[in-house]
Amino acid sequence: MQLSSVYLFYYLYLKMEKFVVFGRYCQDAIFKREPFREQHLNRLKNLKDRDILVTLGPTKCTKYLFGIFNANDVNELKDLIEEDIYWEKGIWINYDIYPWIQAF
């Protein structure tokens, strides 16, 4: 990667905002998600590799999801969430997005 590309990457990364996502899984999500899990996890890895996804996963009770994302704005993040197979297949049934300021 050329030096100018590295600077551009960090400029764009620092320009992105951070967002917290809280959502809810459907009933029996552990079983219903199985046919789509590999596709979902591959997509998340891609988002992580592109520094869009910081972290994402279910709560211990598996009723809720929690995630931290980098995005240019709320609409971009909504599109990312709704393009996920879990949203398309009804595994995730709702979500809320909150702009987040990382203190440290």
Predicted regions and their residues:
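Short, Lys/Arg-enriched N-terminal segments with co-localized hydrophobic residues
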Residues: M1-K15
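Conserved, structured core segments of small domains
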Residues: M16-F104
